[in-house]
Each structure stands twice: as structure tokens, then as C-alpha cells.
């Protein structure tokens, strides 16, 4: 038996108006949440989430995410942009679930681009698989500064491009620790790829970090740096009064006028 349902024109118009009102309300709520920084935006049919800088908050990432850095307020200035950053005296944890990829783009004009930065006196844990595309005159792939710990667990791919022309002021660093900090990297892969016109290149910098340690436990660690111009310095590992440990397979490949 076939059941026939009749919808009168008036009912259809009322339902259409009701749906329109609901969509308008949802749109207003979404805009309010975005303005308040409460949530990110889902694009591409729900497969990829877009976010600004993840800063001073715990987060569990359950779907692929694209981060476009929009916060440059780190270390007392306003032109040091980062994809993931921590500035507090507390513990912050960002976890991307298994199978999830987080891609980040950080661009700074007349400033610094950083992938991950921890500059408070707390602990920053970043777990999962991440890639960072950094572009600025001065670049830091991973930076830890100021009596704290930075723990990375997963696969990390860092591609840094610097247009810096002044080797005295423009510096590109893959991983660095300063002022009483420890960095531990665990996982299958750490891949750092640096290209610059004429900035100074440092693959790993463990400087002014008396008694502290950077430990690379990744199964495969690759640090590649290419300087296109001439007259600058390219250094693989720079350490002073500190310890840098490499466990696993390590490749450090430097190409520059002075190595």
C-alpha cells in the first residue's frame, strides 16, 4: 500500500522560512564562535580543519588540519609568528590523533617565522604528525627558550625558506634550545630542510644552555641546509656548555660558501 502525504503550499512556505531562519541562526552562532576564538573552521567537506595559531591551550586534533599562523606576539614583540606556541608557566599538550596530519604555514614580513615555540617557564608537549612551511628573513623551526621542557612525539617535517640577505642579522635555525631548556624528540622521522639566499644557517643550536640537553631519538633524522648566495656561514650543530644527543640514523647535509 502506498501512503500519500500532501503538503499544502502554505505549509511549504512556512517550512522554507523556518529552514532559512535556522540557517541564519547557525551562521550567526558560527561567526560569534569564530570571533571569540572558540572554534576553528571546517572546510573541504569536513575532511580538513583550518585554524590560526594554537597558543596556550590544550588541544586534541581528530581530523586533518591546516594551520595558518596569525599570532605574532611571542617573546615580548609582535612580529614573531608561530604555528604552535606556549608562553605560560604551565603544561600545554597538543595531540593529533593517529592517521591525522597537521600542515602549517607561517609567514612573517619583517619578522620571524617559527613552527613550534615554547617561551614560558612551563612544559610543551606536541604529539602526532606535523609539517611546517616557514617563510621569513629569520626562521626558527623548533625553538625552546626559558627554563622549560619541550617534548615532541611523532613525525615532524620542517621546510624553512629565508630570503635574508644579511648574514649578521638574518639567521635560519632548524632546532634550538636557550637558557636552561631541554628538548626531546621521539618518533619515526624528523626532517629539516632549510634554504636561504644569504642568511646564516644553523641546523641545531644548543647555545647558552649550560648543563641542558637536546636529545634526538627519531629513527631517522635528516638536516639539510642549502645557501644560495655567498659569504655566509652554515653550521650543522652548534653547542656550548650543553649536550646534544643523536640516537638513530642521522644525516646532516650542508651546502654553503663557508661550512
What positions do the PLM features span?
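Surface-exposed loop/turn motifs in large extracellular/passenger domains
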Residues: 49-259
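Bacterial Sec-dependent N-terminal signal peptides
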Residues: 1-43
